[in-house]
Each structure stands twice: as structure tokens, then as C-alpha cells.
Amino acid sequence: MNTLQGPVSFKDVAVDFTQEEWQQLDPDEKITYRDVMLENYSHLVSVGYDTTKPNVIIKLEQGEEPWIMGGEFPCQHSPEAWRVDDLIERIQENEDKHSRQAACINSKTLTEEKENTFSQIYMETSLVPSSIIAHNCVSCGKNLESISQLISSDGSYARTKPDECNECGKTYHGEKMCEFNQNGDTYSHNEENILQKISILEKPFEYNECMEALDNEAVFIAHKRAYIGEKPYEWNDSGPDFIQMSNFNAYQRSQMEMKPFECSECGKSFCKKSKFIIHQRAHTGEKPYECNVCGKSFSQKGTLTVHRRSHLEEKPYKCNECGKTFCQKLHLTQHLRTHSGEKPYECSECGKTFCQKTHLTLHQRNHSGERPYPCNECGKSFSRKSALSDHQRTHTGEKLYKCNECGKSYYRKSTLITHQRTHTGEKPYQCSECGKFFSRVSYLTIHYRSHLEEKPYECNECGKTFNLNSAFIRHRKVHTEEKSHECSECGKFSQLYLTDHHTAHLEEKPYECNECGKTFLVNSAFDGHQPLPKGEKSYECNVCGKLFNELSYYTEHYRSHSEEKPYGCSECGKTFSHNSSLFRHQRVHTGEKPYECYECGKFFSQKSYLTIHHRIHSGEKPYECSKCGKVFSRMSNLTVHYRSHSGEKPYECNECGKVFSQKSYLTVHYRTHSGEKPYECNECGKKFHHRSAFNSHQRIHRRGNMNVLDVENL
């Protein structure tokens, strides 16, 4: 067994990728690569390797993509580096006690037990034939012992006229075009294709001027072996038969069947034990790698490495557009697409494009219906792991995301970010048609339809169209709703309040007010009676000074001062500052009245209307005048009444300047200027401005009719 001729360098254990090759790796392979390379470098440092930190290590530590530029020389493209692939795999899978078949000198193959430490594995493995170890560099004249030293000694990398490989088009120095052969037999192109398919990675490369010092035939055959991946062949230093192919057929068969690790849960197979172990953690939930800062656990070491950077304050990558900073260059690259609008990933099903591949993968689950993340509590499944995590907090009650301004907490980070805009006033979404800004992308989407007049939701029953799915669903209830619940006592039908209706027969009033002892049949009537909650009112409107004890009330009130009305009705064009207001308004068009009175069966479009209506049956009048003690069933009636004490008359006529205490009085008065007389007598055709005058006139006809009847009876 030969040992290494010369010191161990980082290039002897490094594997490089071009940008194209790097993009072909899946995320797990990239993480594994990062772990292995960083571990290899740490081993070298631990045994005394002392030199400038390689660029690839710097890139990996900073989270950058470690692929090399076209002009750089890739470490893995020498024959020894290909043998080092086995070395790296054994370091990664150090639990596997048996080493792979080792290269041997003079056509002899040795197989022996390897130790798990890096130094023992490396020193016991002969990487290249002894006959090609000692060479002089043609550029600098140095006498070098190892291929890695020979390759790295020259910085010029001048290229001479090359020969060309007829299989892949790569160019090499030397006259003889060598082939895979044994006893003159040439392997077919089909067999070469099979070798390409069983290769883990395709690694094309070029050699520089320094490689003229080596046997050109050996270099060219080493290039052909790049399509094979594993190195089961014997090394031979006897000239043209540099690689012996006697074991090729057996190796080819073993490679095509080389996925011995099968998952018993899902049946997926793996060629590497390390990947199989990582995959199993997806089923077991095992997360052995814990962050020592926040305690968060991960199933892969590479994922933990990336996570640790989130705790670092250093964010060297800054966006020139918006100033946002990132700790990884990859994150900056992805962020820049939000400004450029670049979306390189397209869905083959619907044509929708995305700026990140992960977003495309998640979107495609909408088409496939795949929901791989089930909740252990309720069995509900989700297409995203983050959605499952958010959902599970609804079972635990945990709210991790807290607003620093008002202290309100949320299950989801995205909900917190949206909420914080109510404090900052940020409106990042702009309409390209009119330039209006919105705080949520959903608001912008709804608004944009007002420009397009798009109404994609059509009712199959009546043909009516809607621009909102929610409005369409509410409208359908008009056609499908039936009174299917019959009271066994009186035969009355009630879809919504059958249980409450039964209590009316039992004369049971389960809802009692703790303040006055009054009882109610239904919870809605009880809620309407209860006094407002007492306590500190910490939210003050800076426009009118009004106080609120809940942020949601304050937010809704504040919009009454602003001109923002992002919610537009697709039917009549009326706009609203709150989505709930639009929701209620649309019932005017759909005819939906979901709130039913359990007493008389009357339906209402709003719950507040039902609550007020209930007071007719209960006789409740919760609003009392502090001046005279008169009580009212509605707050609006109390407000109007109070003006009789204060003398306030806020409604002024634009024509004559006369003022009124009620808006209805102003409306009636305005008819004297417009000449409108909406009330017409069916008897004589006379018209009136006021209903009261019309009613008085009607009495004249009724009295006249009574006199005629009296005369006829005489």
C-alpha cells in the first residue's frame, strides 16, 4: 500500500461544481455538500493544515452558492479527486464499517477495513498510480510530486491546441484519442448512455497547460470516467492499459440496482444510508440538531447551520431598491425578484409563474390535492408545514407573535405583519390604473376588479354575476335556503332559531342580567341589553378625541375620518371603509336575510336590526334620557330626543339656511324648494309635500263617506 506523496492539500478533498451543476442538485444534496465540505476543512485545520481559507469555504460560511466560474479550475476534475469522492462519502457515512474497493497499483485490488477518522482514511488510500506522481510543471519548472500540486502551481492556465472527445465535445491535449476498451473492443454508445444515467452527477471539465506534464492518454481516460461516478476499476501503470475494464459488466449491473435502503413507511428507496436516515426523520419527527441560542430543533445539520445565521446581527447583503438587508446572498437574490418582477418558475398546469421554486412546488399541490401534513389533534391536513404549525396553535392556544405597539398577539407572523400596518399606516400595494395604495394585496385585488368590471362568479339559477366569491356564496343561499325545521308545538318553521323558539313554549328565560336581574329568552337579546364593558379606554382618536377600549373599534372609527374606502360594491359602485360594511350592504342586492325573529318569524339582513326588533316583543328600552328620564329602545332615538333639551339643530338647508334637529325634517322641508309632492290622494288626485298633510286630507274623504252612509241609512 502506497501512501500520499507529499502533504495533504484542501484541493485533495474538495469537490467543486459549476453553476449549471449546482442548480441540478436538490436541496438535501446541497445541504449535505455544505456539511461535508465544512467538516473536511475542519479536519484539515485540526491536523495542522495552515493556509489561506479557500474561497469555497468562505462562500459556504456566508451562505452564498459555492459554484465556480467558468475560468476557475475545478478541484474534482483530476483522477485523484474522483477517488476522493469515495473518501468524502465515507466521512459522511462513518457509521458504515466497510470501505469501498480501493485503488491499487500494478493491477492488484485491495479491500480492507478503514477507520472513521479523516486522517486514517486519507493516509490509507492511494489516490493515483506511482508512475505518474513525479512531474515537472512546464510553465514554472517546479518538481512536484502530487497532481494537486501540479495543477495548482501555475496561475496562468494557458491552453494549447486541443483534441476533441467525440462523445461529449470536451477538448484535451495530446494526439491519441483513447476509448474505453479491453482487447480492442469498443463499448457502444448505448452503454455510454447507461453510464451517464447511473452517474450521480455529470462533471465535465477541461485541463490546463500544466497537464501536458502528465500522460495525455491517462488524462483523457480520466475524463471519460467522469461520466461513470464510482471507481470500481483497477489502476494500472503499464502504459495504454491504464484502466482495466474486466469488472465493468458486473459493476454496471450493481450500480443500476444500487438503492438498498428502502423506507418502510412510504416505499421510497435510497442509494445512500445517510439520505435514508435523513428521510426517516420526516416520518418519526426526530430533530437531533438543536440551536443553542433559541432551542429550536432541526432534522438536518445543514438546516441548523443556516438557521444560526438568523441570530447574527450582521446582514451584509443590502437591497439597493428598498434598503432591506439579508444575512445570505441567496435571500437577497430572491428578494430582488420582487422589484424586477422576474418569475422564472412556471406551473405546467395553469401557466402561473413564481419567483421562487419552492413557491411553485407549494402551488402545484393545489392541482394535485396533495396535503402531506396532517394534524394529530383533529386529522385536518395541510399542503404546507407552516400552515400546520399555525393550525396547531389553535389547539394549544399559543400566540407567538406579539405586537409591540398594542400588545395584541397572533398565531401567525403574517397576520402580525398585516396588523402592524394599522399602526404605521404603510400601504405597499399600489393600483397600476389609478395609483391608489392599499395595505393588503387582497384589497388591491378587489379594487382592481372595479377597473376591469370583471365578474367571474355567475349564478346558475338566475344568471346574476358577482366579482367576489363571498358575495356569490351568500347569493346562492337565496335559492337554496329552505325552512326545514318545524316546531313540534305549534308547527312553525325556523331554520336558525328552532332551539330558542322551543324555549318560548317552555317560558324558560335562561339569560339573566347580573346588573338588574332581567331575564331573556335568547342570547342575542341579552347581548343587546348588557351595558358596555367598563374599564380603561386606552385608544384615543387624535382627530376627534373619542376613546375606545378595543383597538378594532378604534381602527374602524379612524377610517370614518380618512377618505380611504377600499371596499367597493360591484352592483352599485358604492364604497365602504370596512369590509363588514360592504358585506352587510350587499345583502340589499342579494335579498339575503339570515337573521330570523323566533317570536314572529320575521327575517332581517343584519343582526343589529334583529336585536332592535326583539325589543318590540320584550318591551326593553335600555336607553334613558339623563335630563327627563324618558327611555327609548334605540340609541338613535335617544340622540334625536336629547336635541330637544340641548337645542342642537345640526341639519341646515342649503337654499334658505333654515336648521333642523332631525335629518328627516330637513328632507321634508327641502321639498318646498324642489316642488316635489310624493303623496297623492287616490280620491281627488291632490298631492302633498308632507305625509302628515296627506293623512289629514284623507280624513276629509273618510268623513264625507261617513256622512253619505248616514244619509242613505235614513
Swiss-Prot record:
GO terms for biological process: negative regulation of DNA-templated transcription; regulation of DNA-templated transcription; regulation of transcription by RNA polymerase II. Residues 171-260 are annotated as: Required for interaction with RB1. GO terms for cellular component: nucleoplasm; nucleus. InterPro entries: KRAB, KRAB_dom_sf, Znf_C2H2_sf, Znf_C2H2_type. A zinc finger (C2H2-type) spans 261-283, 289-311, 317-339, 345-367, 373-395, 401-423, 429-451, 457-479, 485-505, 511-533, 539-561, 567-589, 595-617, 623-645, 651-673, 679-701. SMART domains: KRAB, ZnF_C2H2. Gene3D superfamilies: 6.10.140.140, Classic Zinc Finger. There is a cross-link at residues 97, 259, 315, 357, 534, 537 (Glycyl lysine isopeptide (Lys-Gly) (interchain with G-Cter in SUMO2)). Residues 417-714 are annotated as: Interaction with AR. Keywords: Activator, Isopeptide bond, Metal-binding, Nucleus, Repeat, Repressor, Transcription, Transcription regulation, Ubl conjugation, Zinc, Zinc-finger. Coiled coil: none annotated. Belongs to the krueppel C2H2-type zinc-finger protein family. May repress E2F-dependent transcription. May promote AR-dependent transcription. Interacts with AR and RB1. May also interact with other nuclear hormone receptors such as NR3C1/GR. PANTHER family: C2H2-TYPE DOMAIN-CONTAINING PROTEIN, ZINC FINGER AND SCAN DOMAIN-CONTAINING. This is RB-associated KRAB zinc finger protein. It comes from Homo sapiens (Human).
